[in-house]
């Protein structure tokens, strides 16, 4: 049953571009693409994970901690606040946060009037060849959050978080109407023949379909080489950013090499009606899910 006489439409956008290791160049590129998305009618615009520079987590280097900045008065966040206010758009802004002795992979949510609605700190921190984030980041302490923006209540999580269905469900249970996942993912340095892009996309398509919400994923492109004590480490980021609809269908997608500005429009009231009528939240049995609070399945 569709909502009688009501339409609450929102246009979302996913950006995709290659990063250099120069902050000013990358932030300028992000601003240029935000403006392009706005020109296409976008209301909420997602920039990829840690877009200020190279994905430095390929290597464990002490000097890379200098890239972290405090959340308060962060220059890139401040610039994006001005841009959001000028254009009247919502912009989640990914950054490497320094908080006293802690460091986080964080994202600030900027509303359409330039207001900073707060931050989410990445909860799931990966640790593997080429993705050595545990060296740099503390586990996030914010928990999964939703943010009431001008256009929608949104849930935002970061990269490795996207592989966990519990994160998506937690955000939608709190009222998230759209899920956003900024990402930095590509080839595996230890196995250049391993290509996870289809798996990556299908996992998130499942989150969209299981929760009956649209989902926006933004990834970078290009080859990045980081010098390590054992020689250069290289990742080719595979892009393929996409927007999924509430049944998990892909409604907009980028390729693996090109800069892109994806847009898609959704009627949130119609989706809410379908989510309610489908029954996946009505028929939940939280009393049976206590096993999810364990690491090994033993209660």
Swiss-Prot record:
Q: How does activity depend on temperature?
A: Optimum temperature is 40 degrees Celsius.
NCBIfam families in the record? agmatine_aguB (TIGR03381)
Q: Which residues form the active site?
A: 49, 122, 159
Give an example GO molecular function. Answer: N-carbamoylputrescine amidase activity
The superkingdom of the source organism is Eukaryota
The protein here is known as N-carbamoylputrescine amidase
Q: Which reaction does it catalyse?
A: N-carbamoylputrescine + H2O + 2 H(+) = putrescine + NH4(+) + CO2
Quote the SUPFAM superfamilies the UniProt record gives.
Carbon-nitrogen hydrolase
The reply to whether Transferase figures as a keyword in the UniProt entry is no
Q: What protein family does this chain belong to?
A: Belongs to the carbon-nitrogen hydrolase superfamily.
Sum up the protein's function in the record's words: Involved in polyamine biosynthesis. Catalyzes the hydrolysis of N-carbamoylputrescine to produce putrescine and ammonia.
Instruction: Tell me one GO biological process term.
Output: putrescine biosynthetic process
Give the gene symbol: CPA
This protein's pathway: Amine and polyamine biosynthesis; putrescine biosynthesis via agmatine pathway; putrescine from N-carbamoylputrescine (amidase route): step 1/1
Annotated organism of origin: Arabidopsis thaliana (Mouse-ear cress)
Matching InterPro entries: Aliph_Amidase/BUP, C-N_Hydrolase, C-N_Hydrolase_sf, N-carbamoylputrescine_amidase
């Amino acid at each position: 049953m569709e909502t009688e006489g009501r339409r609450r439409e929102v246009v979302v956008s996913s950006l995709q571009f290659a990063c250099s290791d120069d902050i000013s160049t990358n932030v300028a590129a992000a601003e240029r693409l935000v403006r392009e998305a706005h020109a296409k009618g976008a209301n909420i615009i997602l920039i990829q994970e840690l877009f200020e520079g190279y994905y430095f987590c390929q290597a464990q280097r002490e000097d890379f901690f200098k890239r972290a900045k405090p959340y308060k008065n962060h220059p890139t966040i401040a610039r994006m606040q001005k841009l959001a206010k000028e254009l009247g758009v919502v912009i989640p802004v990914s950054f490497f946060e320094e908080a006293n002795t802690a460091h986080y992979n964080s994202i600030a949510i900027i509303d359409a009037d330039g207001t900073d609605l707060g931050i989410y700190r990445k909860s799931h921190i990966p640790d593997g060849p080429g993705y050595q984030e545990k060296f740099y980041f503390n586990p996030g302490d914010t928990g999964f959050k939703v943010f009431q923006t001008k256009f929608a209540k949104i849930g935002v999580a970061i990269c490795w978080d996207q592989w966990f269905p519990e994160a998506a469900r937690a955000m939608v249970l709190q009222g998230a109407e759209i899920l956003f996942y900024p990402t930095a993912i590509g080839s595996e340095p230890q196995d250049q023949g391993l290509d996870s892009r289809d798996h990556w996309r299908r996992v998130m398509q499942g989150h969209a379909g299981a929760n009956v919400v649209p989902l926006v994923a933004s990834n970078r492109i290009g080859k990045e080489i980081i010098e390590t004590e054992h020689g250069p480490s290289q990742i080719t980021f595979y892009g393929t950013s996409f927007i999924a609809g509430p049944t998990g269908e892909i409604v907009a997608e980028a390729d693996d090499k090109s800069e892109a500005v994806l847009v898609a429009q959704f009627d949130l009231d119609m989706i809410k009606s379908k989510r309610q009528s489908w029954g996946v939240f009505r028929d939940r049995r939280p009393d049976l899910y206590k096993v999810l609070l364990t690491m090994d399945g033993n209660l």
